[in-house]
C-alpha cells in the first residue's frame, strides 16, 4: 500500500526467490528454522517470542534470534490486531456487553499480561518486557480500513506468482 502494486509484486517475487524453503509451519517453527540454520531471517509475531522464553525446550532456539522491526526509517512496522464483530446474533445486546467487557481496562490488562500483546485500550500499557523489546520502534499508522482495501490485489499477486508453491 505504501509503494504501489508494481513495487509490491516485484518485492514479493524477490522475497519468494530468497526463501530458504517453501512457506510452512507456525511462528515457533520459523524461530526453530533459524536455530537449525535453515534460514537467517524469519517473520513472526512478537508475542511468540515471549511464549518461547517461558518454554525450556524452545528457549534455546532464541539464542540465535533477536526481534527486529522493519521499516524503521520510513513508515514503521505493521502491527497485527485481534478483531471482533457481531453477525446475525439473536442476543445482540449481550454481544455488545461482551465486546465492551473485552475492551475494558480490566480485560485488556489480563489480555496484555497473559499474551504479551498490545492492548487496544489506551488506558492499559503493554507489559514491561514487551515495552523493553519494542523500545524505540515505530509502528505503521496506516488506517486498517485502507489496508484492508488492498486485500484482493494482494491475494491476486500471491496467486499469480504462486507464492506458496
What label would you give each PLM region?
Residues 126-165:
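Extracellular/periplasmic bilobal clamshell ligand-binding domains
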Residues 29, 70-73, 116:
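Residues that form or immediately flank small-molecule/cofactor binding pockets and catalytic motifs
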Residues 12, 31, 35, 43, ...:
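Non-transmembrane alpha-helical segments in soluble domains
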Residues 1-68:
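Ligand-binding pocket segment of bilobal, Venus flytrap-like solute-binding proteins
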Residues 82-141:
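Mature extracytoplasmic/periplasmic domains
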Residues 6, 25-28, 43, 89-93, ...:
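Soluble non-cytosolic domains of exported or imported proteins
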Residues 59-78, 87-89:
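Short beta-strand->loop
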Amino acid at each position: 500500500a505504501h509503494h504501489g502494486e508494481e513495487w509490491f509484486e516485484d518485492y514479493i517475487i524477490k522475497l519468494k526467490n530468497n526463501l530458504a524453503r517453501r512457506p510452512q509451519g507456525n511462528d515457533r517453527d520459523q524461530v526453530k528454522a533459524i536455530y537449525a540454520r535453515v534460514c537467517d531471517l524469519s517473520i513472526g509475531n512478537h508475542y511468540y517470542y515471549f511464549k518461547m522464553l517461558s518454554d525450556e525446550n524452545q528457549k534455546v532456539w532464541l539464542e540465535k534470534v533477536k526481534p527486529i522491526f522493519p521499516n524503521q526509517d520510513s513508515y514503521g512496522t505493521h502491527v497485527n490486531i485481534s478483531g471482533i464483530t457481531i453477525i446475525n446474533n439473536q442476543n445482540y445486546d449481550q454481544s455488545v456487553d461482551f465486546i465492551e467487557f473485552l475492551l475494558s481496562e480490566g480485560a485488556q490488562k489480563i489480555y496484555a499480561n497473559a499474551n504479551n500483546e498490545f492492548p487496544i485500550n489506551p488506558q492499559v500499557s503493554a507489559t514491561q518486557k514487551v515495552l523493553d523489546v519494542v523500545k524505540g520502534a515505530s509502528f505503521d499508522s496506516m488506517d486498517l480500513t485502507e489496508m484492508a482495501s488492498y486485500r484482493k490485489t494482494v491475494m491476486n499477486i500471491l496467486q499469480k506468482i504462486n507464492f506458496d508453491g
